[in-house]
Amino acid sequence: AMVCAAKGYPLVITMAESFSIERRRLMRFLGAKVVLTPKEERGIGMYNTAKKLAADNGWFFAGQFENAANADIHESTTAREILADFQDSPLDYWVTGYGTGGTVTGVARALRRERPNCKIIVSEPHNATLLGSGLPQERNADDSPNGSHPAWEPHVIQGWTPDFIPKVLQEGIDSAFFDEVRPVDGMKGMAMAQHLAANEG
């Protein structure tokens, strides 16, 4: 939304009606049009609505859940920042969650190549263990998700673990990038984030 605002590009964002008012307001503040989807349709409903709107109107669809450029940019930027921060010291663990899968896959590529001893730990909600379940994601011919993953249940942190395994994340699974998948209680995760912000900056 910030890039579109800076470049003057019109932007339409789909959001489930269960998303926070603050998130909607921020997107609108940045000039985006927000289209709400029924909360019962989960993330897959937002995805399908965005895809249909783009197709019906001739708009560009970013397809961030399938677009390889998502992981590529994190491999060439985010990973470089992390490695630069640990240039003169060991990097024992990298712990992350996932949304589209771009950050975790892109950074994991670089860590596997340049810091092979670093343990990569992926967290997901304790009540939405998509990776931990070992169950595959059903996909359409274009690699888009064919419905919600059977292990997903609603959880408290928006943007963390959608109700399907993104194609971008599938690369990390297939390449065995992850040393461990750790389920985390969302409420405990938020409490720890507040603790870290207050005590570590």
PLM regions: where:
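Short Gly/Thr/Asp-enriched flexible loops that form oxyanion-binding sites at enzyme active sites
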Residues: 1-7, 104-114, 118, 123
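Active-site-proximal loop->helix
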Residues: 1-53, 130-145, 166-172
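Short glycine/serine/threonine/alanine-rich loop segments
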Residues: 9, 32, 59, 116-118
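Generic beta-sheet signal
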Residues: 14, 37, 64, 121-123
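Conserved hydrophobic/aromatic pocket- or pore-lining residues that grip, position, or stack substrates
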Residues: 27, 82, 120
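Active-site/ligand-binding loops adjacent to catalytic centers
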Residues: 47-48, 57, 113-200
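Active-site/ligand-binding-proximal alpha/beta "capping" segment
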Residues: 57-102, 106-110, 171-175, 179, ...
